[in-house]
Curated annotation (Swiss-Prot):
Plays a critical role in cytoplasmic virus egress. Participates in the final step of tegumentation and envelope acquisition within the host cytoplasm by directly interacting with the capsid. Upon virion binding to target cell, a signaling cascade is triggered to disrupt the interaction with the capsid, thereby preparing capsid uncoating. Interacts with cytoplasmic envelopment protein 3 and with the capsid. The gene is UL16. Signal peptide: none annotated. Residues 1-38 are annotated as: Disordered. It is found in: Virion tegument; Host cytoplasm; Host nucleus. It comes from the Viruses. This is Cytoplasmic envelopment protein 2.
């Protein structure tokens, strides 16, 4: 373990009782004291789990990358939580890459400084391979190998000094990312993300029930979500939401952005409030009843979710996911017209798994050895 590699900033020296400047989260190098460092393979595992890195600066002698991702269990071992409650479930990582002549590094090997939530740093030498996004040079994936702890430099860069872009450069959810499919192999090897939405463990992809374009055109103006959970939440959640029904925070991990309205709306975690928080499967229609016609051929007073979260199964039959109930207690099957079982690409699936704490938590739990 590299005891000198991981550092935690201390308070900037100043007069007794002086407050830190607004937004201050770092400190100059001489104010830093070493903390015990994690194993190099832990940092390598974290770095290689990052979905997308966004270029902050690409100078000839210094390259700076940044990513945002859900705060995972490995990250909790190296990163302090962000004090902002809206950001506490996420981690911001800065990566500085240089090739100091004094180190005589081999080809494709760099001196790297990782900053985790701007509070802790890890210095290492690392062999690096990169793949640029097909539509923009500002996004890439990085593969880290032979990561070895290194002594920190005398001068440490300050992430707060960097100018960060606040607009997306890739619009992954604007295209036809919902691809109709039949069913999944090993359909029981999955975990539930929402009603009619599953993470397929062998393939690492999301399957979900969604409307086709013709049916989607009948949705309220401005709504871009098409998946079943979103529609059911609009039908059953009371107007205004709020409290326990308020939407959870999301980021855009594909663009390293804190604001992510498109990701939050389209995320398969969007589901009826009473299902998400109380595990109720019979839900009264308390929201926009006019939207029921997108799912049922007859009026209904309630919807019934037929799959238990403990033993989910990806199904190509919509009535195995949801049915309605009318005032006479009769069961109303959903109409199949306009609805398709869809699969998301591995890329888009990872976007949601690294942007949504609920999806990340469900996948991690299902992937663990003790999941039953």
């Amino acid at each position: 373990m590299a005891q000198r590699a991981l550092w935690r900033p201390q308070a900037t020296p100043g007069p007794p009782g002086a407050a830190a400047p607004p937004g201050h989260r770092g400190a100059p190098p001489d104010a830093r004291a070493p903390d015990p460092g994690p194993e190099a393979d832990l940092v390598a595992r974290i770095a290689n789990s990052v979905f997308v890195w966004r270029v902050v600066r690409g100078d000839e002698r210094l390259k700076i990358f940044r990513c945002l991702t859900v705060l995972t269990e490995p990250l909790c071992q190296v990163a302090l939580p962000d004090p902002d409650p809206e950001r506490a479930l996420f981690c911001e990582i800065f990566l500085y890459l240089t090739r100091p002549k004094a180190l005589r590094l081999p080809s494709n090997t760099f001196f790297a400084i990782f900053f985790f939530n701007r509070e802790r740093r890890y210095c290492a030498t690392v062999h690096l391979r990169s793949v640029t996004h097909p539509r923009t040079p500002l996004l890439c994936t990085l593969a880290f190998g032979h990561l070895e702890a290194a002594s920190p430099p005398e001068e440490t860069p300050d992430p707060a000094a960097e100018q960060l872009a606040d607009e997306p450069v890739a619009h992954e959810l604007d295209g036809a990312y919902l691809v109709p499919t039949d069913t999944a192999p090993e359909s029981g090897a999955c975990c539930a993300l929402g009603p009619g939405a599953w993470w397929h463990l062998p393939g690492g992809r999301i399957y979900c029930w969604a409307m086709d374009d013709d049916l989607g055109s009948l949705c309220p103006p401005g709504s871009r979500a098409r998946h079943l959970g979103w529609l059911l939440s609009r039908i059953t959640d009371p107007p205004g939401g709020g409290g326990a029904c308020a939407p959870t925070a999301h980021i855009d991990s594909a663009n390293a952005l804190w604001r992510a309205p498109a990701v939050a709306e389209a995320c398969p975690c969007v589901a009826p409030c009473m299902w998400s928080n109380m595990a109720q499967r019979t839900l009264a229609v308390r929201g926009d009843a006019s939207l029921c016609q997108l799912l049922f051929g007859h009026p209904v007073d309630a919807v019934i979710l037929r799959q238990a979260t403990r033993r989910p199964r990806i199904t190509a039959h919509l009535h195995e996911v949801v049915v309605g109930r009318d005032g006479a207690e009769s069961v109303i099957r959903p109409t199949s017209a306009g609805w398709r079982l869809c699969v998301l690409s591995s890329y888009t699936s990872r976007l949601f798994a690294t942007s949504c704490p609920a999806v990340a938590r469900a996948v991690a739990r299902a992937s663990s050895s003790d999941y039953k």
